[in-house]
Amino acid sequence: MIQVRVSGTKYRKARRSWFHLRRIGLRKDRYGAYTGELKGRRQVEKLKRYCEKKRLSFRIDNEYGRRGGSYRSIFFQTHAPAFGNYYFCAYCGRLLPKDRVTVDHLYPVGSASRDLKLQKKLKRHIRGINDPDNLIAACRACNQKKGTEMGRWIRRGKIGRHAWYWELRWSFRFALAAGVIFLAVWLIAVR
């Protein structure tokens, strides 16, 4: 289902576009948005180009663009804590108690509702935007920093969701620091 929403100063342009929107099968709902079902990627792409040309906002409404209300409880049912009642932030590795965890969508809901290529990719890998494989633990700062960005955040989230990664990283850092201290003490003792 494709929804074309009328917003602010673009209202006049949308009023002038009503004929074209009705011709392709969209109808005005009680909220002032044009809604309807479109079949096929070609028809959706054509509508997307038309909306961009006329400066209309639009949103693709499907299972990949809707945030469920229970995704936080789904996350805690399917993901065990790393230590006791603590989770790792998938982006920075900070240990967080369960009540401080912000459950984040690895692939953002907003991007999934607008991007057809991302929707196609998600259909191959996960069952929906609220699938447990798309949910990760994050601290509030990292979640706000990420926003709707993808790119490096996706890579960091996929690697950082595993507790062993942070344990290995911290062990390596500790070993490196211990090695540097040992080397410094040895150099002082040799003199």
Kindly give the residue locations of the regions a language model identified.
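Short, charged surface segments at domain edges that flank catalytic/cofactor-binding sites
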Residues: 45, 49-93, 122-129
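Short Fe-S-cluster ligation motifs
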Residues: 117-140, 165-186
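The −1 position to Zn-ligating cysteines in a subset of zinc-ribbon hairpins
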Residues: 88, 102, 138
